Amino acid sequence: MGFVGAIAIGTILLLLPGMTAPGRSTTFVDALFTATSAVTTTGLASVDTATHWTFLGQLAIIVMTQVGGLGILISAALVGVLLARRLSLRTRLNAASEFQAEGFTDLRKLVRAVVGLTLLIEAIVALLLFLRFLIHYGWDVGRAAWNAVFDSISAFANLGFALQTDNMMGFVSDPFVCLPLCAGVILGGLGFPVIVQLWRDWAHPLRWSMNTNLMVTGTIGLLVLGSAYLTFVEWDNPDTFGRLDPPARVLAGFFASTMTRTGGFNSVDLAAMRDESWFASDVLMFIGAGPASVGGGIRVTTFLVLFFIMLAELRGEGNVNIFGKRLSRAVHRQAITIVLISVAVVVAPTLLLLQLTEFPLGRVLFEVISAFSTTGLSTGITPDLPDSAKIVLAVVMLVGRVGPLTLGGALVLRERRILYEFPRERPVVG
C-alpha cells in the first residue's frame, strides 16, 4: 500500500496551484497518471514535462521519483535507521524482502550502503552533465544545474523524464551526455544487492553470488545484442540513424538498447523507427532490468534462469547448474510463474486498449509493455489516449513496479503446506 499512498499524495500535490505552467490546466487523470509514472519510475507522460509543469511541479515529480526509486519500504527503513536507530523485526523482514536479501542481520548496513551509493552515482552523473551543459552548450548555471540534477536522478531511477521537449534527441551525437545517462540507467537497473556486491568485491569475481553473475553476464549480453541489432536495422533509416555519421549511429544504437532496459530516454523519434526495431524493443523491455532494482520487466535473472533450464532439458540433465552452483527447484516454479503472470498482465490490457482506442496493435503493445516494464518509452500515443486508457496504463505501471510474483504472494498471504501427495503422472507435452 506504500506505493498507492505515495501516488495519492503525488496526485494531490500536482493538482495544487503553482504546479502547472501559466495558460495550462491539469486534469485529475493527468495528475494521477504523472504521479503513478513518477512513483513507479516508469516515465510515460501524458503531458510534456518540460512545458506543462512549473519548477515546483518538476521538483515534486523528481522527489516522487527518488522516493519510488528507493522503494517505500526502504525509505521507511532508512527513517528508522537515522531517527529511531532501531528497526522492528517486521520492518527488517519486509525490507529484506524488498532487497531480495538472503538474511536481515546486516540490513541496516545494506540500507546505508544503498542510499550512499545511490546519492554518489547520481552526484557523479549530475556533475558530468552539469559541466557539459555549462561549458559546451553555454547554459547559465541555474539551468545547467537543475537539468543535470533532474536528468541524473531520472537516469538512475530508470525514469526517462527529461526537461527538454524532445527528450534527448538534441544530444543524439553527444557522447558526453549520452554515456553518463547510460551509465546511470545501467547501474540503476542492476539491482541494489548487485551494486553493493560489485562495490565490495569488484576485484574478486569468484566471490560473486549467482544473482550477481547472472546480472552482469545478462546485462552485457543484452546490451551488446540489442545495440548491434538496433544499429543494423536503423542504420540507413533517414528518419532515425540514417542522418547521423557512423560513430553517432553506433552511439545512438547503444543508447537505444540501454534505454529499452527500462531507461526511458530517447535520442531519436521512436515513432519513426522500423517495425523490426519496435519488436526488438518490446522483447528487451519485457525482459527488463534486475531484481530489487528500480527497473521492471520479468527481470534479467528470470530470463536467464529459463534459458539455462531450457539448456539443461535439451542436454538431458536432471539438475540446472549455473556458474558452478545448482539452481534451486523452487526457482524453476517462480520463474515460470513470473513469466506467465507477466504475459497475462501484458495481454489483457493490450486487448482492452485495442477496444478503447483506434491505434494499431504495434503501438498499443509497445505502450503496454513499456508501462508493465516501467520503461517509459513511447511511440507518441500516450498523450492522445482517452482517460479510460490512461487509467488502464496507470494500473499496469503499478503492477509492473510491485512485481507479478509479489502481487500474487500478497493475494495468497501465506504459503500453504500440503501434508499429502497425489500419485505422480506425466502428461504428454510438446
Describe the role of every protein-language-model region.
Residues M1-G430:
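Membrane-proximal intracellular helices of multi-pass ion channels
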